């Protein structure tokens, strides 16, 4: 399989972003056994490919075990993943659990199956990780998934909550990691096409229309078309939180402001920002000063004392 220079740049970017996420969040450590969850979709194929590449040159030793959960969906091509995983030389396990029948029995026709399906999958994955001695569980969620989840929780749950790149399971037995947290869905899709991964569609829930996640995803993609880079900016915001400028009394001691126990810089008190204001001009207008808008720019880092 021959590839262009554009492909190698794409591959390098994905590997670099994944390596940075692993380092930033301490996702993988020396001696870890990582259970790589394979659904047969573009995200999990890409995750495995990138992790295998990083494993070869990482300064630490860790083990990868690929896992696929055969949920007994009618028409599921059982041979595809075993053949692929064997061809790339990774240790793997196929776990059979008829979660499909349970979902179809419990969920009324026309209702979303995602929630129950996800809970059942988690249970099987955690049990498999324990049986195999895997202390890390890798999922294929990417940057766009994280931003999508943030808006879902905000719109429908009233919480500023996203999808963490790393978290512990409820019983503390395993750490769940998302190595593709810094990678865009667009890059992953391009990589999967170039690599010609044998993609397996999700027939159980993929055809259900008008789901909240689908609507939010469409909204974000429209924003991205109108203003390229917006999804990346939103993700950057999730990594640059200022608790004193929100309204959660659990995150910031607002009551302490009256007694000097908590402080906020004085510029913020008067609404000053670190944004650069630029003139807003209209098509055919010669007047560049009729209105101004705010454009985000990070404030320059303060120079050390004594710097000329």
Swiss-Prot record:
Enzymatic class: transferase
Domain of life: Bacteria
Example GO biological process: tRNA thio-modification
EC numbers for this chain: 2.8.1.-
Compartments, record wording: Cytoplasm
Residues involved in [4Fe-4S] cluster binding: 114, 117, 205
Keywords: 4Fe-4S, ATP-binding, Cytoplasm, Iron, Iron-sulfur, Magnesium, Metal-binding, Nucleotide-binding, RNA-binding, Transferase, tRNA processing, tRNA-binding
Pfam families: ATP_bind_3
Record flagged with keyword ATP-binding: yes
Pathway terms, separated by semicolons: tRNA modification
Reactions that this protein is recorded to catalyse: cytidine(32) in tRNA + S-sulfanyl-L-cysteinyl-[cysteine desulfurase] + AH2 + ATP = 2-thiocytidine(32) in tRNA + L-cysteinyl-[cysteine desulfurase] + A + AMP + diphosphate + H(+)
Misc. comment: The thiolation reaction likely consists of two steps: a first activation step by ATP to form an adenylated intermediate of the target base of tRNA, and a second nucleophilic substitution step of the sulfur (S) atom supplied by the hydrosulfide attached to the Fe-S cluster.
Subunit organization: Homodimer.
Protein task: Catalyzes the ATP-dependent 2-thiolation of cytidine in position 32 of tRNA, to form 2-thiocytidine (s(2)C32). The sulfur atoms are provided by the cysteine/cysteine desulfurase (IscS) system.
Similarity comment: Belongs to the TtcA family.
Protein name: tRNA-cytidine(32) 2-sulfurtransferase
Lineage: Bacteria, Pseudomonadati, Pseudomonadota, Betaproteobacteria, Burkholderiales
UniProt gene name: ttcA
């Amino acid at each position: 399989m021959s590839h262009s220079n554009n492909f190698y740049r794409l591959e390098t970017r994905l590997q670099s972003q994944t390596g940075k996420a692993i380092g930033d969040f301490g996702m993988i450590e020396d001696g870890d056994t990582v259970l790589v969850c394979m659904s047969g979709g573009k995200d999990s194929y890409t995750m495995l490919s990138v992790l295998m590449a990083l494993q070869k040159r990482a300064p630490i030793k860790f083990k990868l075990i690929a896992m696929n959960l055969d949920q007994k969906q009618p028409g599921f091509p059982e041979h595809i993943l075993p053949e692929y995983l064997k061809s790339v030389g990774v240790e793997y396990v196929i776990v059979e659990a008829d979660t499909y029948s349970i979902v179809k029995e419990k969920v009324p026709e026309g209702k979303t199956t995602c929630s129950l399906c996800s809970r059942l999958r988690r249970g099987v994955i955690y049990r498999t990780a324990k049986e195999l001695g895997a202390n890390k569980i890798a999922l294929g969620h990417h940057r766009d998934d994280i931003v999508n989840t943030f808006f879902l929780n905000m719109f429908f749950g009233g919480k500023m909550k996203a999808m963490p790149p790393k978290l512990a399971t409820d019983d503390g037995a395993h750490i769940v990691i998302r190595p593709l947290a810094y990678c865009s869905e667009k890059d992953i899709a391009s990589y999967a096409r170039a690599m010609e991964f044998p993609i397996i569609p999700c027939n159980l829930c993929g055809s259900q229309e008008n789901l909240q996640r689908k609507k939010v995803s469409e909204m974000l993609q429209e924003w991205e078309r109108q203003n390229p880079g917006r999804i990346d900016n939103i993700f950057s915001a999730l990594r640059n939180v200022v608790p004193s400028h929100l309204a959660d009394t659990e995150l910031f001691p607002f009551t302490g402001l009256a007694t000097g126990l908590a402080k906020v810089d004085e510029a913020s008190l008067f609404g000053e920002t670190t944004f650069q204001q630029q003139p807003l001009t209209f098509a055919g207008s010669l007047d560049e000063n009729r209105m101004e808008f705010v454009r985000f720019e990070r404030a320059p880092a303060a120079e050390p004392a004594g710097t000329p």
